[in-house]
Every structure is written in structure tokens, then in C-alpha cells.
UniProtKB/Swiss-Prot annotation:
GO molecular function terms noted in the UniProt entry: ribonuclease P activity; zinc ion binding
Identification of the protein by name: Ribonuclease P protein component 4
Swiss-Prot/TrEMBL cofactor(s): Zn(2+)
Pfam families: Rpr2
Cofactor binding note from Swiss-Prot or TrEMBL: Binds 1 zinc ion per subunit.
Keyword Metal-binding listed: yes
Similarity annotation: Belongs to the eukaryotic/archaeal RNase P protein component 4 family.
GO biological process, one term: tRNA 5'-leader removal
Record's subunit section: Consists of a catalytic RNA component and at least 4-5 protein subunits.
Cellular compartment(s): Cytoplasm
Enzyme class: hydrolase
Reactions accelerated catalytically: Endonucleolytic cleavage of RNA, removing 5'-extranucleotides from tRNA precursor
């Protein structure tokens, strides 16, 4: 296995472990896991997959868990995700999936 694949696999493991740790209540340890994953990403020049990149706050590195560390609001087809620790906000445009409401 190539070294970049090993690093990417480790980054994903760390982010998933951070998410599990945060659910158990240890936010400081979860932040450290995410900071470590970010460091691996920078040093290895590897992009974090979008699915995992959206799992944590980019300002304070807290795993975003709806209702615990994150608030989600939908306003006029825009999803607003707010970190409850540092009040950082991220907006995503919501679009209808192609082919989901096709009439036959």
C-alpha cells in the first residue's frame, strides 16, 4: 500500500474516533484527534474527503454533533450549520436531487 493511502486511512480513522469520543463527552480529546488528522493532511499534502471535512468545525476543531455541539437551521433553501462552542457558521445551498421527484 502506498504511503499516501496509509496516511489518508489514518486521517479517516482519527476523525471517526474523534466523533465517537465527542459523543461520549470528551471534547478536548476529540479536538486533539482532529488537530492531529489536520496535521497529517497538511504534512502529507492529502485532501480530507468532503464527507469527513464537514464533520468538524474548521475554527475550533470540535466534532459537529447535531444538538450537542452544532445547531442546524434551514432558511430559504440554505442549510446553516452553527458550532455551539465558537459560533462559527457555514452555509450550504440545498438543491433537490436530480430524478427524485420525476413524474411517470
Amino acid at each position: 500500500m502506498r504511503i499516501k493511502n496509509k496516511i489518508k486511512k489514518r486521517i479517516i480513522e482519527l476523525i471517526e474516533l474523534a466523533y465517537i469520543t465527542a459523543r461520549k463527552g470528551d471534547l478536548e480529546l476529540a479536538r486533539e484527534y482532529i488537530k492531529l488528522a489536520e496535521m497529517y493532511s497538511r504534512k502529507g499534502r492529502i485532501k480530507i474527503p468532503l464527507k469527513y471535512k464537514r464533520m468538524f468545525c474548521r475554527k475550533c476543531y470540535t466534532p459537529l454533533i447535531t444538538g450537542v455541539t452544532e445547531r442546524r437551521r434551514i432558511r430559504s433553501k440554505i442549510l446553516i450549520r452553527t458550532c455551539l462552542i465558537c459560533n462559527w457558521q457555514r452555509r450550504y445551498v440545498l438543491s433537490r436531487n436530480k430524478g427524485s421527484n420525476k413524474e411517470n
